Amino acid sequence: MNNSLHSLSSGEGPPVILLHGLFGQGSNLRGVARALESNFTVHCLDLPDHGRSPWLAHASLSSYAERVEDWMTTHDIEAAHVLGHSLGGKVAMELALSRPERINKLVVADVAPVEYPGNHDRIIEALLRVAVRPCSSRGEAQLILEESIDEPGVVAYLMMGLARVGDTYRWRFNVEGLQAAYPALRAAPRPGAVHEGGALFLRGADSNYVLPAYEAEIGRRFPASQVVTIPDAGHWIHIDQAETFQHRVLEFLS
């Protein structure tokens, strides 16, 4: 059995690894990959329990970071630039804090090295309702989500993780496993550790994921970092202001 993470690779040049958010998949970051692939070899990974990657018995930031490092070793990548959004940003921070020699430059998109409250409980409950009830169409699954989630953008994002299996539709991600692991995934990465390497934290001006109160902790854990606010962007910062986001990332990595 192949336990390696699923990946999509493109471009040529120094390696860049892209890590998606909770309930997502590597293809969510293809827009970022296309912007980088003229200068870098870009690898969009499906995190464990997501997309086409294996599911874990016990998920945590450390176990996810270990799987990313294993993938790097398997693909003969000693070190890489790593960019992560949301949960992917936490996994990227965990890897940088635990194995700094594997990170060239770190980019963290709209998340901080802090423990977050359980704001996804409502979403998880909606996902579970789809999981336990075989849906014969995408529309049926979407209606179930819309009963609990009144944000069209969130529903559209989640629907990208729905796949046809035989005559029904199922989630590509491990809903039950992610529900059980949710407290561990909300936790702060590698408490007490410090990463001295270069790091760029990009936050959306309209998002509440990287509050001003978190800047001191970012500076303490990542003393060589800079925090940049992108106007008119929410949590999906790489979509809301794609051109500005891509420019900032290219400028930093180059």
Predicted region positions:
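Conserved alpha/beta-hydrolase catalytic His-Asp/Glu region
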Residues: 133-189
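Catalytic histidine-centered segment of alpha/beta-hydrolase-like enzymes
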Residues: 233-246
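Serine-hydrolase catalytic-loop signature spanning alpha/beta hydrolases and amidase-signature enzymes
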Residues: 23-31
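Flexible "cap/lid" loop of the alpha/beta hydrolase fold
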Residues: 94-97, 104-135
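Conserved serine/cysteine hydrolase catalytic core
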Residues: 167-221, 226-229
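Active-site loop/oxyanion-hole signature of alpha/beta-hydrolase fold enzymes
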Residues: 3, 8, 31-34, 43-84, ...
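Alpha/beta-hydrolase fold catalytic core
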Residues: 1-17, 34-41, 75-79, 180-183, ...
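Active-site glycine-rich loops that stabilize anionic/oxyanionic intermediates
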Residues: 21-24, 86
